[in-house]
Amino acid sequence: MYAYIKGTLTELNPTHVVVEASGVGYEIQTPNSYRFQKYMDHEVVVHTSLIVREDAQLLYGFINQEEKDMFLSLIKVTGIGPKSALAILASSSPNDVKIAIENENDAYLTKFPGIGKKTARQIVLDLKGKVQINDVDSSQILNTDTQDHANAPIIKEALLALEALGYSKRELTKVEKSLSKETFDSVDDAVKRGLQLLIA
């Protein structure tokens, strides 16, 4: 119904963003809302997908079309709902997920919250050969670049975002120690690093 929404980014929360367009504020669930941080109070285009349930109409949003397409592919897999698909895309780029699928790397897929061996195998069975990998070496899963020292407010926001993705306080306590030894320019960077540590 909504291919994308173009408007002003007015709110940034661990699980969603709010975009105001034509006087209406759209609450949009995102894999990692802090990817939109640089657009705060500025115009942004969010690629969206509306999912209607018996009890709710939920709008999901993505930083680009590739991320949206990967989300739509994932939720077609038996056992994968929107929440699990968002958790996967919060923890990894669409291309890394595609590479894991094509390489039948079940171990990589089971590192995401809520994805067990059976579901990981189902993802591979359903999507292998149906996803387009970008021009990279498909024998490797790419890692996100990280930085070096700590910033408490950023780390605090990042931990809230990770908790919203379904990670336990016990897991986050371990990650917090590692994050505190590094520094980050943005919450997005800290979230990405935290996700790397959690799925390592």
UniProtKB/Swiss-Prot annotation:
Keywords: Cytoplasm, DNA damage, DNA recombination, DNA repair, DNA-binding. Its main location: cytoplasm. Residues 150-200 are annotated as: Domain III. Residues 64-142 are annotated as: Domain II. Residues 143-149 are annotated as: Flexible linker. GO terms for cellular component: cytoplasm; Holliday junction helicase complex; Holliday junction resolvase complex. GO terms for molecular function: ATP binding; four-way junction DNA binding; four-way junction helicase activity. Residues 1-63 are annotated as: Domain I. This is Holliday junction branch migration complex subunit RuvA. It comes from Staphylococcus saprophyticus subsp. saprophyticus (strain ATCC 15305 / DSM 20229 / NCIMB 8711 / NCTC 7292 / S-41).
